[in-house]
Regions:
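Extended, small/polar residue-biased N-terminal targeting/export presequences
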Residues: 78-133, 200-203, 208-223
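A generic structural motif
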Residues: 10, 125, 193-197
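Cleft-lining beta-strand/loop regions that shape enzyme active-site pockets
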Residues: 38, 53-55, 61, 144-150, ...
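Sequence signature of WD/YWTD-type beta-propeller architectures
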Residues: 1-103, 246
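Solvent-exposed, polar/charged alpha-helical surfaces in well-ordered, non-transmembrane soluble domains
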Residues: 26, 42-46, 50, 67, ...
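PDZ/PDZ-like groove recognition
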Residues: 49-72, 123-143, 234
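PDZ/PDZ-like domain segments forming the peptide/carboxylate-binding groove
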Residues: 115-174, 244-245
Length: 328
């Protein structure tokens, strides 16, 4: 029996507590095992084949000769030299079914979190012996606490053109990259030595573990500017990243501004899927029934609120998956 991290041997015919002699704890630290990777990879390949055959939604595997597919790919397992190669083979094998929601999810890829490099939310120029120039500090999105560059924190305020000279007193250059200097710094305070023009100063920052939210909002802002420029300000833009709570929140974060225009470009490219597409369709299908006018309004407001004032176009690509594919 396993409970959390403890493995025990207990009777199956009656209940025992932890102090009962019949409750025997197994010390896993004393176990030793020898793994032959190639044997393990063969087992993983064969098990994947059995699982797909057992759980596939159609007994005839949608017309695919599954056993022939396995025979075709199985010899490749004897030619690989890493588990990453095996994952590639499994992806190719499952891909022969041409079926959505058929994934290969590798295990144990998180690594040691204490060694994770910190990120500063900026783009950099070519490093020199004088340091690493900041080409651009990513603006971020003030309404999302996860989408804010550490370099824009209070008391830091680094700008485009500043040069990071050192991290925790360790000088950057050809012998020490910024990435190396920030290794293991995610979520903890580090000191940057920065040159702004002719002035040197030291600032304390807390690097991020993940820039994805920051980069996402920056990308959305760039697409919004593109649509505004190309349409002469007539079209609004919004992006829905997935069909779960995050995407639902993003829709409402962006819809107020988007629906102030004559039409809307609704972007679901790279949508991760989920289950809220029907809600999204209902929300974007809201029709104008009336108008609210106010003395200080720069434009009349729709009734119901945030209804699309004109045509709506949906943009998608091959990376919109599941519910994100259905909606488009």
């Amino acid at each position: 029996m396993r409970h959390k991290d403890e493995v025990s041997v207990v009777p199956s015919d009656h209940k025992v507590d932890a102090e009962d002699p019949a409750h025997v704890a197994v010390d896993l630290t004393r176990l030793r095992r020898r793994i032959t990777p190639r044997d393990e990879w063969r087992q993983m390949f064969d098990e994947n084949g059995r699982l797909m055959a057992t759980h596939y939604w159609r007994d005839d595997m949608n017309g695919v000769d599954w056993e022939a597919v396995l025979r075709r790919y199985r010899p490749l397992v004897d030619r690989i030299h890493s588990v990453d190669d095996l994952y590639d083979i499994l992806w190719e094998t499952v891909g022969e079914l041409n079926t959505s929601h058929s994934y290969v999810s590798p295990a144990g890829l998180d690594g040691d979190p204490s060694l994770r490099a910190g990120l500063l939310g900026a783009d950099y120029g070519v490093p020199t012996d004088d340091g690493v120039p900041i080409v651009r500090v990513v603006p971020g999105e003030s309404s999302d606490p996860l989408a804010w560059s550490p370099l824009r924190a209070a008391g830091v305020a680094l700008r485009d053109g500043d040069v990071i000279v050192a991290v925790d007193g360790n000088k950057l250059g050809h012998d020490l990259s910024l990435g190396e200097a920030l290794e293991g710094s995610a979520g903890r305070t580090v000191e940057l030595t920065v040159r702004t023009g002719d002035q040197m100063r030291r600032v304390a920052v807390v690097p991020m573990a993940d820039e994805a939210p920051l980069r996402y909002h920056d990308w959305v802002a760039s697409r919004r500017r593109y649509v505004e420029e190309r349409s002469g300000g007539r079209l609004g833009y919004l992006h829905v990243p997935d069909m779960v709570s995050n995407g639902w929140a993003e829709l409402h974060r962006q819809i107020v501004e988007a629906t102030r225009h004559e039409g809307v470009v609704a972007d679901v490219r790279f949508n991760h899927g989920g289950h809220t597409s029907q809600l999204v369709v209902e929300r974007l299908s809201r029709q104008v029934l009336g108008w609210d006018f106010g003395k200080w309004y720069d434009t009349p407001a729709t009734y119901p609120q945030n209804a699309v004032r004109g045509p709506i176009v949906m943009v998608t690509n091959q990376w919109a998956g599941s519910d994100g594919d259905i909606v488009s």
